[in-house]
Amino acid sequence: MNTPKRNILFLLIFLLLFAGSSIYLFKDKINRLFFEPNVPSAGGSVSFEEGASVKDNKPIEIIAENLKIPWEIAFLPDKDVLVTERPGTILRVGTDRKIYHIEGVESSGERGLMGLVLHPNFEQNKLIYLYFTTDTNGTLRNKIERYRLEKDNLYDKTVIIDNIPGSIYHDGGRIEFGPDGMLYITTGDAGQPHLAQNKNSLAGKILRIEDDGSIPEDNPYKNAVWTYGHRNSQGLVWDNQGRLWATEHGRSGAQSGLDELNLIEKGKNYGWPTIQGDETRTEMETPVINSGPNYTWAPADIEFINGSLFFSGLRGEALYEAKINDLVTPERISSAPEIKIHFLKEFGRLRATRLSPDGYLYITTSNTDGRGEPKSGDDKLIRIDPEIFANR
């Protein structure tokens, strides 16, 4: 073969090899971007440290399997566990397994039966509260209904609050009673970001109401709104100093990230959609910590244990820990806490995170919600001894 032909052949071989490797690299990049859970990367607003694993030989027990998109956990005085399932059922796990069906739940997309909380005086009044989505002639709304759980059945349905804007996405859904006896509610922006800045709308807010649905006299805006400027907050917890913390889902899609951990204060504006992440604007709050633009938690729920905030990650597929007691002053926070990552990719997508009265941490997986990769037995209710997190 003469030299020109040999050179052309070598050039063609080189181009084919280069094209093949480029296609592989491009495919690998697409797979990582859209289909793999994010892993810690340089930059962003937090530092990361490896945490607990199922390999640590501490007690981790599967309490229930084959759940249907479990969303919330509550503990009854008899030690039975209630778990909401997004399609519209409540599973009672204990000596007897019972299912309660809730009428009128619209459950496609992210909507459905979500929050559940017992009244602070449940042992006397037997009242429970449920947050769920309804569809009335094509109009989606979220509402809270109250029931009396007695003699193993639900009675006396009462609507506590309704007309919370709903959507296929961004429906919020967490409900908690605070130390002040008030009911706090997270709502999403219902896919309409501008509603988060409208104090007359119940979308994109943290709400605060009396246990009967009436408006407390000390609310900042004479309606149910406690704070505003939220995209889709789905976790609420009070620490041992009485401060309220909330998790917040950041932006979606290929450019996901900027998930938030916020310290919630009466009447404040948390910025969505005007600011996000480390951006600032007068009279708008920036998060205590955010995941940065290159990392996604998709934080679903939050719990406080021994000086740390533990929050579950959906797309992040992990349980995250932020130690705050050494960093928080009586008024604010002095620096961003380090994040420990527990159970990375070991259970898949995690949603509910609840500390039981006897000191165990209960979590649920969310691998059957259409965005995960279900394994045998999914979805699961899992019980963890918090000792697994010690000295990690």
Question: Which stretches of residues belong to each language-model region?
Answer:
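N-terminal Sec-pathway targeting helices
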Residues: 1-16
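Conserved beta-strand position repeated across blades of beta-propeller domains
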Residues: 74, 117, 176, 237, ...
